[in-house]
Design a protein with these regions (language model features):
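Terminal amphipathic alpha-helical/low-complexity segments used for targeting or macromolecular assembly
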Residues: 1-8, 13-14, 19-20, 56, ...
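Structural signal for interior beta-strand "rungs" in well-ordered beta-sheet cores
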Residues: 4-184, 188-189
């Protein structure tokens, strides 16, 4: 289908725009930009150099994609923001491109970023993530597939959040949040296994029980976290989910969030 592009939009002729794209008045699109098929760009959106957008994305009013990183190390190098397919950016979202030459900020497929969310430079976001109103993710973070952030969450630089974890509203955290759990509070603490989401994903009951047993060893045991990992390997039946937990904890550089 033909594109529907307002003559009041400001679009650099070098920008690569796919098929069946709708661009509303007063959108601003720079030249080093790729926009896939079936995207909708609302009024007053800025799509800036280095942005590579997949198919079927929706970008609402006043959002800025590919903004220069808010990082004193940035020297004007050519960097990118990579956006997957069917991503929704609601009003006033800001996503920065990477800092150093050749670097990328990445947003996976089918993510949903609510009003006022901000994803900073060099952060990597997996698919199917949700970012609530006003949530701010600092630079160099790693967000796993299906992670859910409630409103007004602040993730400090370089933290990791595991697959299908949920961060409760108003939480600020500076340590890693392992997969499949709920975390919240001040200071942030473990709040149990995210059974609601695991049920939604149709994870078997025995797998959910194994996940709960693994985290019982980590958060309720009397040993160090890394001794708890050894106990998980010895006591909890193996599965991809258990391996995900083990590998995540072994890979932490900042440490994981507090015990109860």
């Amino acid at each position: 289908m033909a594109n529907q592009i307002s003559d009041k939009a400001v679009i650099d002729p070098k920008a690569q725009i796919g098929d069946n794209v709708t661009i509303y008045p007063f959108a601003y699109i720079e030249g080093d930009v790729v926009i896939g098929d079936n995207c909708v760009i609302a009024p007053n959106v800025n799509v800036l150099n280095g942005t590579r957008m997949g198919n079927g994305c929706k970008v609402f009013q006043n959002t800025v994609l590919g903004a220069m990183p808010q990082d004193f190390h940035f020297k004007g190098d050519k960097t990118e923001l990579i956006i997957g397919n069917k991503v929704t950016f609601r009003e006033n979202v800001v996503v920065n491109r990477a800092t150093f030459a050749g670097g990328q900020t990445v947003i996976g497929d089918k993510c949903f970023l609510m009003e006022g969310a901000h994803i900073s430079h060099d952060t990597k976001v997996g698919s199917h993530c949700v970012f609530g109103y006003g949530t701010k993710i600092a630079g160099d973070c790693e967000i796993g597939r299906g992670a859910v952030f409630s409103s007004n969450v602040i993730a400090n630089p370089k933290v990791r959040v595991g697959d299908n974890a949920m961060i409760l509203a108003g939480t600020t955290f500076s340590k890693d949040v392992p997969p499949y759990i709920i975390a919240g509070g001040a200071p942030v603490k473990y709040g149990g296994v995210n059974t609601l989401l695991l049920d939604y994903l149709r994870k078997e009951k025995k797998i959910q029980d194994h996940i709960a047993n693994a985290y019982r060893l980590v958060f309720h045991g009397q040993t160090s976290v890394f001794d708890a990992v050894l106990q998980i390997q010895q006591q909890v039946p193996d599965s991809p989910e258990i391996q995900n937990i083990i590998n995540f904890i072994k890979g932490t550089k900042l440490g994981i969030i507090c015990k109860l």
